[in-house]
């Protein structure tokens, strides 16, 4: 297996008049830091978008719902392996771990726990024993993200807080109604930081093609998986994958190198009010340029970026980095997408 280069990911997206990540133990209100007021989106939420997009692209995934229902790990592994129902079927596979990782695309990225539930049936127990002897207790995913905190303090839109839905009887009469908890933020812009660990990639068979797939997967997942009523209003704005030369080096914490520019509006309501200052990011990339192999970049022209005294559109960021001497790959999200 080819040794991968280590990569850092910086993925910025925004959320307008929606609930980007409700807290189920907090009345499903949008997550916020109680001290700073910053909005929060968990890495779990982002990974769910990515898994769902992988599945829509035709790739098998392990962690999923089928027909809207959650299932046991035993049911999930039978589903992802396809045609495997008992211990004899597992034996016919030969190398079970290789077959599982080949099929479970999401596990190659994010890892998973593989403890299987006990059963009173002898046949099921034999299957569980065969699984446990063939697979580790867990795979640690080589692709990980930190939860994201918004660059701005977010406000909850109280106008959406209580909404009454009226059901029609079909005879022109309105019958009853019920309240919908509709808790949304006015606007937030969220930078995610992630790491592709070249060492951990070997344990899950993460391939070069898998890593390159991230360059379009993240963008398209935000476009395609945020179409429900409460999630609509999220858009990808900037994606940068810093692919390093061989070795175990990375800068770390690229999200902390971004801040709101001075020309941002005092009260943010849409991307038109935002300027993101990427000066420190650009300076950092220049400082470690001899350690960087390639910068993989795509941006949305509706987001403005400050670099020193210059303001550019995010879709021009790749060109700015190229002119600064970096080897830059301008990502074509649609033409480079990888479908199964």
UniProtKB/Swiss-Prot annotation:
Asked if the Swiss-Prot or TrEMBL record annotates the protein with the keyword GTP-binding, the reply is: no
UniProt keyword list:
Antiviral defense, Cytoplasm, Plasmid
Q: Name one GO cellular component term.
A: cytoplasm
The record ties this protein, via InterPro entries, to: Cas7_Csh2/Csh2 (IPR006482), CRISPR-assoc_prot_Cas7/Csh2 (IPR013419)
Any GO BP annotation: defense response to virus
User: Which Pfam family, giving just one, matches this sequence?
Assistant: Cas_Cas7
**Misc. remarks from the entry:** There are 3 CRISPR RNA loci in this organism and a single cas gene locus. A CRISPR-Cas type I-B system.
Query: What name appears for this protein in its UniProt entry?
Result: CRISPR-associated protein Cas7
What lineage does the source organism belong to? Archaea, Methanobacteriati, Methanobacteriota, Stenosarchaea group, Halobacteria
Give me the gene this protein comes from: cas7
């Amino acid at each position: 297996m080819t040794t991968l280069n280590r990569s850092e990911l910086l993925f910025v997206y925004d959320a307008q008049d929606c609930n980007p990540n409700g807290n189920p133990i907090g009345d499903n209100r949008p997550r916020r830091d109680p001290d700073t007021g910053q909005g929060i989106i968990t890495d779990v939420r982002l990974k769910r978008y990515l898994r769902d997009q992988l599945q829509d692209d035709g790739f098998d995934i392990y962690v999923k719902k089928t027909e809207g229902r959650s299932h046991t790990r035993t049911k999930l592994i039978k589903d992802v392996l396809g045609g495997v129902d008992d211990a004899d079927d597992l034996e016919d596979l030969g190398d079970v771990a290789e077959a599982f990782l080949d099929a479970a695309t999401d596990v190659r990225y994010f890892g998973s726990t593989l403890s299987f539930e006990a059963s009173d049936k002898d046949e099921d127990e034999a299957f569980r024993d065969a699984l446990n002897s063939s697979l580790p207790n867990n795979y640690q995913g080589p692709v990980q993200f930190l939860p994201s905190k918004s660059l701005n303090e977010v406000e909850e839109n109280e106008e959406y807080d209580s909404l009454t839905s009226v059901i029609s009887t079909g005879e022109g009469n309105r019958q009853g109604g019920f309240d919908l908890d509709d808790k949304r933020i006015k606007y937030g812009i969220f930078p995610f930081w992630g790491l592709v660990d070249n060492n951990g990639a070997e344990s899950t068979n993460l391939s070069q093609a898998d890593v390159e797939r991230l360059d379009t997967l993240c963008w398209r997942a935000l476009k395609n998986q945020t179409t429900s009523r409460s999630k609509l209003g999220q858009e990808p704005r900037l994606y940068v994958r810093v692919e390093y030369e061989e070795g175990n080096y990375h800068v770390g914490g690229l999200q902390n190198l971004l801040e709101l520019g001075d020309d941002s509006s005092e009260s943010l309501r849409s991307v038109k009010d935002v300027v993101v200052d990427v000066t420190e990011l650009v300076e950092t990339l220049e400082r470690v340029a001899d350690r960087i192999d390639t910068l993989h970049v795509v941006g949305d022209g509706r987001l403005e970026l400050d670099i020193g005294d210059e303001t550019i559109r995010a879709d021009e960021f790749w060109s700015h980095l190229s002119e600064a001497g970096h080897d830059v790959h301008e990502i074509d999200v649609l033409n480079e997408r990888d479908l199964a």
